Structures are given as structure tokens and as C-alpha cells.
Amino acid sequence: MAEPVRLGRKRPLPVCPNPLFVRWLTEWRDEAASRGRHTRFVFQKALRSLQRYPLPLRSGKEAKILQHFGDRLCRMLDEKLKQHLASGGDHAPSSPSGKKGASKGPPEQVQDSSMPVPTQPQAGSTSVGYWPAQNSGAREILLQLYREHLNSDGHSFLTKEELLQKCAQKTPRVVPGSSKPWPALRSLLHRNLILGTHRPARYALTPEGLELAQKLAEAEGLSTRHAGFRPEEHHGEDSAVPEALSEPGTTEGAVQQRPLELRPSEYRVLLCVDIGETRGAGHRPEMLRELQRLRVPHTVRKLHVGDFVWVAQETRPRDPERPGELVLDHIVERKRLDDLCSSIIDGRFREQKFRLKRCGLGHRVYLVEEHGSVHNLSLPESTLLQAVTNTQVIDGFFVKRTMDIKESAGYLALLTKGLERLYQGHTLRSRPWGAPGAAESEAKPSTNPLCSLLTFSDFNAEAVKNKAQSVREVFARQLMQVRGLSGEKAAAVVDRYSTPASLLAAYDACATAKEQEMLLSTIKCGRLQRNLGPALSRTLYQLYCSHSPLS
């Protein structure tokens, strides 16, 4: 007699890949809820994001690829994990006790979270036996993500734009346009070697991809020393260095590029015109015609900040298609009066000045060009005059007013000739982004030009407006939308409270509503270190603590 068919579950329920992190986030959420703090919402969002993530995490740093995980929360997880292991914990956050395939080594031997962790490939994985070809797009993607993983100052992920930019430096033939599909990226996603999260997508290595990338790096002789990075060293809480809002870190491209040195006879001064200045209806724009008439050597490019910059271009380069270029320490932003009026109304005026201050160049020129009658504009003449005056007196820009486009072109021609004379006979050298340079030239006026300059690629890459931003940077931009809150004031607030969550926690710790209103009033701002003041402090309190619609 045949045995009866036994119906049952064919697949076991999936085991939680990160039980410790889930448990700790749940505890923190419940504790915040019991105290009535707003941080419970932060922990709840992070918990949901973690529960949807199917792969194991070996440190809090790795959790940064997930949504709602900021620097502070990742540090909290790492500190909690360190305490757990120090108290005799017998497994990592991604290896629940009793789970098959748990690490067999002694519990005391815990690898550094910033170093590659080799894992066994899963059964049935499509990545088993896969080895990307030399100079292929897939190989370069894995290596670039591996470098980012080793970078202690990085995020352990890259966006598609960042991947395209970095891979184009090594294998330009296999890199498509930014709007086109990338077969190599799709193949790695299909093989479960990389993981895509967020929108726009962020790509990071999976454990299988990390193991393969480590083998590729060893095959190419790439190590943490050759990559220009060092593994993260854990020295307790003192190792956490707060980020500065106005001091962007050194880019990977700046680390990898060989130093560029241009001797006096090896370069020429060239004016770079933003492509936005060249748009015309069926004819070449007047600005380019005037520059050609004045015989100003120039080129048209996409500039992410400013309208005109000058570069020292190599005259006898090794690669004629890619000559070395160093950006001289001057930048010009051109505004017609009608454009100035509209930019003040829609908020671009303050944002553009803030980005110009952070572009890495010390001498900033604001070129204001007359256009038609002032009485036909949306703002009164006194408002425009006040804005221009503030730009010179408060922001420290050099303001130049011209009558028309011909006079503007003539001024650019004079600047070009002046820079040629200024740098004549000087040897120019490249410097990485963030190294001392422009700040020194501003602090100590001198007749000698700044000869330690940014490369054009570094300058333009760091000036990208819509690049991936940290919570700190987005918080600062949000603060700057408040009327009366300048970039310097926003930076001062963010230096004290780096995220909205930390600000809300500070509000929760206040005993009375009056104390909450005055919480930010004594924050020191700007070079004169003046207080933020009660009015702005009250406005920010109403913005972040009001449960009803703002009036």
C-alpha cells in the first residue's frame, strides 16, 4: 500500500540575516517611544529598511547603503556591536546562532569591518566560476566599488554617474552614455555580485561580489596601499572625526592622478566659457563673436559652477586628446539685470553665491551687466543695488558692472591678458581637492599668483550640483530655504546639530517651550561670531516642532 502523500512547506521561512541589528533598533525605537521622542520615527524607518534587506551585514558601516541609515546611526550600531563582542557575544550581527554556515573560528577573532570579508558562494549562485575579462566594464565596476569599500572616508557605495566617471578614466571604450543602459552593470546585478538601492540608484558590493573583487584586485596587484586608501582603524570613540560642511574631502580621482607640473614654456592661458553662454537662436551668440573679434583664446565647455574660468593648458601633452589643465585661481559669474532679478526671486541668487564660495577658487568676480530699463523689472532698483552691494561687502566678491555685452567681453579680454602676465614665468603644480591653496590666497593678499592649482577635472567634478549628498548637506540646504538664514548661519547650525534627528532630540531634551524657542539663539555665526538670534531660533523651532500647518 502506497504511503499517503504528505503535504508540507517545501521551503523553510527565511532566517533574519541581521538579527542583532534588528533587535537593537527595536530596543532603541521602543525606548524613544516610551520617552515621547521623535527619534522613534528615525529608528522605525531604519528598522523597516533593514528588514527588507536580504543580505547579511557585518558592521554598522556596511548598513550605510540602506535607506534611513545615517552616519550617527551606523556609529551607534558599531559601538553596540563592539560592546556585544567585548561582553562575550559569540556571533557577528549577520550570523545568528544555530544558523548553518556560521563562521567556525573562535569568537575573539573578529575581522575589521573595513577589510574584505571572504564568504562562500551560495548554492546555485550564478556567480560561481565567473571571472570578468581584462579591461571589461564588469571588471572595472567591481574594482571601483572595491576601492570605495576600502576607502575609510567613503560611503561603500557609488551612484551610476560616479561609476561612469571613474570607469571612463580606465576603460573609456566600454562606458556608455549616462542615459543609456549599461549591460555590464545589469549583468553584475543579475549575478548577485552588486546590489542597487535607493532612487537614484546606489550600487554596492554583495558578499559574493566583495570576494570576487578582492581576487581581481590581488590578480592585478592592487592593494590598499596602491589604491591610495588605508583600512579604517578603530581606536574607540575618539576616532570619529566630525565632517566640515564647507570642506569637501579629497576625491578618489585626485588621489589616483599623477601630480601635474607645468613649467613656464609648457602651457598657455585659455578662457573657458560655459556652454550656457553660447546658446543662440540660429546664429552664434554675440559673446563668442566679441571674444573672437578681440582674439581671446577660448573654448566652450560645460561648467558646473560659474560662467567663465581660466585654465593653464599643456602645450605639448603626452596625450594630444587629453592635455593636462590646471584651473587658475579666478572665476566669473555673469548676470544680466533681468536674470539677477529673477534669481533673487526664485532663490538661485543665494545658492549660486554659496556654491561659488565652495568651488575651490579664491578670486570670485560677479559681473553685473545692464539690460534694458531698470523700471521694467519685477524688483525695484534699490533692491538690486542692495543685493549687489551685499555681494561685494558681505560675501567678499569683486563686483564689476558693465553697460552691455561688448563691454563684458572687453573686460574678459583684459582679465585674460592680465592673467597671462601674472602667471608668466611661474611653474604651476597640481594639488588635490581640499589641500591648502585658495584659502591661503584669500587670507594673504600678494602680488605673487597662486601656483598650487586644481586640475580642471577635479574642479568640475566637485562642482556638480546634483551629486550624491549626505544627510548633513541636505539638512544645510533645507535650512538655507528659511528667509534670513544664510550659508554661514546654516553651517553654524549644522556644526552644532549635524542632522534633523539630532536637532529634534535636542528639542525633546528641553524642559519648556520657551527653552525650545531659544535653543539656537546663542549659536555663533560667521567671521564676527555673532549670535544667531531669537527671531531665527523661534522660526526654526516653529518649523521643526509645530504639529499644525505653519501660518
Curated annotation (Swiss-Prot):
Mg(2+) 1 binds at residues 274, 277, 307, 333. SUPFAM superfamilies: DNA polymerase beta, N-terminal domain-like, Restriction endonuclease-like. Residues 270-372 form the ERCC4 domain. Mg(2+) 2 binds at residues 277, 307, 333-334. Its main location: nucleus. Residues 471-545 are annotated as: Helix-hairpin-helix (2HhH). The modification Phosphoserine is found at residue 95. Residues 131-230 are annotated as: Winged helix domain (WHD). GO terms for molecular function: 3'-flap endonuclease activity; crossover junction DNA endonuclease activity; DNA binding; double-stranded DNA endonuclease activity; metal ion binding. Its EC number is 3.1.22.-. Disulfide bonds: none annotated. Residues 110-131 have a biased composition (Polar residues). GO terms for biological process: DNA catabolic process; DNA recombination; DNA repair; double-strand break repair; osteoblast proliferation; replication fork processing; response to intra-S DNA damage checkpoint signaling. Part of the heterodimeric DNA structure-specific endonuclease complex MUS81-EME1. Part of the heterodimeric DNA structure-specific endonuclease complex MUS81-EME2. Interacts with BLM; may stimulate the endonuclease activity of MUS81. Interacts with SLX4/BTBD12; this interaction is direct and links the MUS81-EME1 complex to SLX4, which may coordinate the action of the structure-specific endonuclease during DNA repair. Interacts with DCLRE1B/Apollo. Interacts with RECQL5; this interaction stimulates mitotic DNA synthesis. Interacts with CHEK2. Catalytic subunit of two functionally distinct, structure-specific, heterodimeric DNA endonucleases MUS81-EME1 and MUS81-EME2 that are involved in the maintenance of genome stability. Both endonucleases have essentially the same substrate specificity though MUS81-EME2 is more active than its MUS81-EME1 counterpart. Both cleave 3'-flaps and nicked Holliday junctions, and exhibit limited endonuclease activity with 5' flaps and nicked double-stranded DNAs. MUS81-EME2 which is active during the replication of DNA is more specifically involved in replication fork processing. Belongs to the XPF family. This is Structure-specific endonuclease subunit MUS81.
